[in-house]
Amino acid sequence: SNVNAFAIGAQMINPYARIHLEWSALRDHDWKKSLLSQGIRTISGPELTPAKKLSREFGVYRVAEDGAVSNIATPIFDWGRFYEIILRSILEGSWDNSRLTKSHEALNFWFGMESGVIDVILSGQLHYASRKMLTALREGVLSGRIHPFDGEIHSQEGLIKDAQAPRLSSEEIVNMHWLNDN
C-alpha cells in the first residue's frame, strides 16, 4: 500500500509521472544503478540512512548528471507516539492479541499521518511554489480532506474504483495486491 500511496501522490502532482519499481532487497542487484541506467534521476530510496553510512540517498532525492545528490523530502517517524498508541490500546483493553498468534501473517501497524506517527520533512532547497503546494497537500492529508485512496483509481490491470465509490477501507488498503497504473 505504501508503493501505491506514493504512486498515486506522484500522479496527483504530475499526471504524467511514471513509477519504476526496483526491489532493494534482491541479492546481486544494484537497484540504484538500474534506475540511473534507465535515466531515472528522482528516486524514492530508503526512509533512513544507516548511522554507519554517511549518505544523502534517503527519502525522495534527485541525482544530478555529475552524481551530486540533493534531497527533496523524507518521512520521519515518531516511535514514541507509535508505542504510546499501542500501549494505550493495551491499557484500555482494545488491543487484539489474536493478531500475534497468526505466525503465517505479517503484522501490520498502519497509522496514517493524522495519528502523529509519521510526518514528512521538505528540503529547504525546494522551489517556494513546490513547497507551497506540498505543504497544502500535507495539510489536506492531515485534515482528512485529501486521501490517496479517494476518487478514481486504476491499477495496471484496469479500474479499481470509480470516482463515486467510497474511499478504500483500511483493510482494503492493507491487503491490496495490485500496483497503480503509473
Where are these regions (language model features)?
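Extracytosolic ligand-binding ectodomains
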Residues: S1-N182
